[in-house]
Amino acid sequence: TENNTIAVVSPIKGSPAEKVGIKSGDIIESINGKKYDAKHMEDAVKQMRGKAGEKVVIGILDKNGKRKEYTLIKSPIHPQTVGSKVIENNIGYIQIISFEGKTAEEFRKNYEDLKKKNVKGLIIDLRSNPGGLVDQVIDIADQILPRASIVYTNNKNDEKEYFNSDEKESITLPMVVLVNEGSASASEILSGALQDNKAATIVGQQTYGKGVIQSVLQMGDDGGLILTTAQYFTPNGHIVHGKGITPDVKVESSQNTKNKDVQLEKAIEVMKDKIK
């Protein structure tokens, strides 16, 4: 983060971190009793990885300023990054957990399956998706949008690079995208592109606001320098970093509502209006 801390963007669904209750926005202060900051990110990541069955103790500062320690048992994480189903009113639902090496291919297969079932609309769930590979989100946006701007980057020399979709394929169904405070980076590229191109209604909470390309320059054994090399902008020129994507329909978290997903319920309500 800007103040040199290591922040949790969003724990991977089904991961040891999610299971013990680590949340988006939590600050990792220590690992196995040793203090860490963003300049020692690579070492921190190494400490958290390792053999299945090993224990690691993570010291967390949560959003309310409370310090907690969590003991995690390391386990392999091989998430299938895309899942889909048909929900009420014959609405197609696709959840993207993160953007990894085969996510765009998985998205295509899941959408083709839903299309065969003649769904009337599509809800894309990007909640708690921390991002991932930019080429994968560009591919998915290209599958969804007709010829349009997806995102552009601007570096310190004011050089812009534009990413656009072509006319080979597009999804013409009514669409709703679900986001929350754990939707970051590549998730914000996709939701921003669909919002600016008026291809989907965005429902949920303000997103995380991670819109920079960064690298760590190692400075010997004692630390490193975090370099921001470029920034992402939505097609309409909105800054993502530090701001996030503002939903068209705001719905607060469902955490305190027993067995009810109020954000998904609102997305379905919005979709019903679209497919009347």
Q: What is each of the regions a protein language model found here?
A:
Residues 221, 226-230:
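Short acidic, Pro/Gly- and aromatic-enriched capping/linker segments at domain boundaries
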Residues 240, 258, 262-276:
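Conserved functional hotspot residues or short segments at active or partner-binding sites
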